Amino acid sequence: MLRISKLTDYATVLLAALSAQPQALHSASGLADRTGIGAATVSKLLKELHRAGLVSSTRGARGGYQLARPPAHISAAEIIDAVEGPVALTECAIHGGHCELEPTCGVGLSWQRVSRALRSALEGLSLADLMDHDARVRAPNLRAALDAGWQPLTRV
């Protein structure tokens, strides 16, 4: 079964939480509380998302995290790449020449074509697109917090 990892799903939830108030700085602990994702997992994912250029961070007592780009400019492919590595269905779709079966394989090129089509579809799907469908179902803790008047850390 093809499926993204739970960590990629969590990373997407965190990015959606950051996009709720894009100008604000969000603490890792605050994001953990609001999303229901464990604090250690949130910290790990924020580091990976920062390394990939999807979030920016500000250090210090008034620091925190925010999206590095608008949600419409962050693709699903970039999110998956940040957490799981390159999108590909088979090893040869990423690293041609590293498979012992390659000399006799009759399907490698077809899988590469499928991987390219999948990657293209994911590149055409933005974080904004992912958040466009009923956010209450996908991130109930975040929505409840926003509805209750929660305000993240803001720059002073």
Segments predicted by a language model, with ranges:
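Short coil turns linking two alpha-helices in DNA-binding domains
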Residues: 38-41
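Short helix-capping/hinge SLiMs at alpha-helix to coil transitions
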Residues: 19-23, 69-70
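Beta-hairpin "wing" of winged helix-turn-helix
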Residues: 53-68
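A short alpha-helical element within helix-turn-helix/winged-helix DNA-binding domains
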Residues: 26-36
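Alpha-helical residues within the helix-turn-helix
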Residues: 33, 50-51
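C-terminal regulatory/oligomerization modules of transcriptional regulators
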Residues: 98-156
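Conserved segment of winged-helix/HTH DNA-binding domains
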Residues: 71-96, 107-117
